[in-house]
């Protein structure tokens, strides 16, 4: 293990986080929030000084392999969450550091779970930092580092280990030959979609500050609301419709947008994950709308709220226009299934990912056919390409690890003596980076009632879910920390 290289990378990440806090400081300054200006000033100084000291640790070798990639990604996410919590704590707007840490982890992992009962009481600068953390975490902080910091020829291929460890989904490949160019393309698409959404929301009458922050949360599929009633506070079909559409767009694999820009429409239409994603959304919206029709004054309202909540849950954004905890059992069951499945691989969304579900369905179908026809030879194809058994095995092992972590976490948080539904959906929402669960942690509730221990467990679940389990679990493997000769 190259410890100096890990320290060097984390130091660079902390310096970048310090620079990213400057806009939040300026927002606080503009609104005369001098307590928050001081909090951000101290936090920025700490990040820049500590980050620079760590960055000055120069490794003899800059080779990044799987072990270094896992360690850099996992420890970087822990570090940015700890330091990102400082403005909340120093300003005393959230007096308990565990709560500050929970809120910040929820922001960077794009979960959107909150301990705040009155978010509108938070200062503008902290609201900005809270939502901006969604935007930074959506594409990945280390992806940004790869996009803007030259790595050199020798380290370009090795940067793939970092990108694979941080990017969601069972597989990740380069869009172009250079790793840095791949990261730049991803961020250009990400920024462009964010700007378009800001313009559309502002054009629809949403205040500019709200448009920017809601777009940050949508882009990262995070769901931190800046109103107590979430998006339901904006009584506008247009604004809610724009956000619903963009939630779905950010839940699509970003490779699709690159293919569209390259005019490779054949590969887009051939993409099975995209088709499965669209069909799942359409079917879920229709069934839920029929199921909740009696709760609304018209079919239009039923379809509107159904479309918004399906978009929000499947992309793991977590915005809400109404309290879906009060919906009939069938609708709530469908939403829980969508929570588990999540968005497409290579998107900013969380969950198991559509591609994994698709692979598991196809593997199950092939296995059933082998039972009926033992001598038959079945291969698993995705987008017309034959997939090897290793991919199926990896997806299966991921599912096993996911279930084990989910069961263990549910047992740990159950000591707070909340209902089974509250405990399970709290863990599911945190592991899948969704935000709201059902019952006490529903869209109109929050996580403040959990003990400090449960909040730490749920914070760990958020990071585990965002980094897709194995990079975090690898930290507890003694072999990861052995020195290389």
Where are the regions a protein language model picked out?
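Membrane-proximal intracellular helices of multi-pass ion channels
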Residues: 1-485
């Amino acid at each position: 293990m190259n410890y100096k290289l890990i320290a060097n990378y984390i130091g660079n990440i902390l310096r970048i986080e310090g620079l990213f806090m400057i806009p939040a400081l300026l927002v606080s300054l503009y609104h005369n929030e001098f307590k928050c200006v001081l909090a951000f000033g101290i936090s920025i100084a700490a990040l820049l000084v500590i980050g620079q000291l760590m960055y000055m640790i120069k490794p003899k070798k800059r080779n990044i392999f799987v072990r270094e990639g896992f360690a850099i990604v996992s420890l970087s996410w822990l570090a940015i969450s700890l330091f990102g919590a400082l403005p909340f704590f120093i300003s005393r707007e959230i007096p308990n550091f565990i709560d500050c840490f929970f809120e910040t982890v929820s922001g960077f992992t794009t979960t959107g779970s909150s301990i705040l009962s009155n978010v509108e009481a938070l200062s503008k600068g902290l609201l900005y930092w809270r939502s901006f953390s969604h935007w930074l975490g959506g594409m990945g902080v280390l992806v940004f580092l790869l996009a803007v910091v030259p790595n050199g020829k020798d380290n370009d291929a090795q940067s793939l280990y970092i990108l694979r460890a941080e990017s969601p989904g069972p597989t990740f490949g380069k869009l172009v030959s250079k790793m840095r160019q791949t990261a730049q393309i991803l961020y250009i698409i990400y920024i462009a979609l964010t700007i378009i959404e800001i313009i559309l929301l502002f054009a629809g009458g949403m205040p500019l500050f709200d448009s920017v922050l809601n777009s940050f949360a949508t882009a990262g599929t995070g769901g931190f609301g800046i109103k107590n009633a979430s998006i339901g506070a904006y009584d506008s079909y247009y604004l809610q419709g724009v956000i619903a559409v963009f939630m779905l767009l950010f839940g699509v694999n970003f490779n699709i947008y690159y293919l569209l820009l390259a005019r490779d429409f054949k590969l887009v239409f051939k993409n099975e994950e995209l088709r499965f994603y669209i069909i799942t959304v359409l079917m879920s919206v229709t069934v839920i709308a029929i199921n909740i029709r009696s709760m609304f004054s018209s079919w239009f309202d039923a379809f509107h709220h159904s479309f918004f909540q399906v978009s929000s849950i499947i992309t793991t954004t977590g915005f809400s226009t109404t309290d879906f905890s009060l919906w009939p059992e069938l609708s709530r069951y469908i939403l829980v299934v969508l929570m588990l499945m999540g968005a497409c691989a290579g998107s900013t969304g969380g969950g198991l990912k559509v591609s994994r579900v698709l692979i598991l369905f196809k593997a199950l179908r092939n296995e059933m056919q082998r039972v009926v026809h033992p001598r038959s030879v079945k291969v698993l194809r995705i987008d017309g390409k034959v997939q090897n058994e290793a991919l199926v095995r990896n997806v299966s092992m991921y599912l096993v690890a996911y279930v084990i972590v989910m069961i263990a976490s549910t047992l740990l948080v159950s000591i707070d003596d909340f209902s089974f539904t509250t405990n399970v959906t709290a863990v599911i929402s945190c592991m899948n980076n969704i935000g709201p669960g059902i019952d006490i942690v529903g869209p109109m509730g929050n996580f403040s009632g959990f003990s400090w221990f449960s909040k730490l467990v749920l914070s760990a679940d958020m990071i585990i879910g965002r980094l897709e389990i194995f990079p975090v679990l690898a930290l507890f493997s003694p072999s990861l920390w052995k020195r290389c000769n």
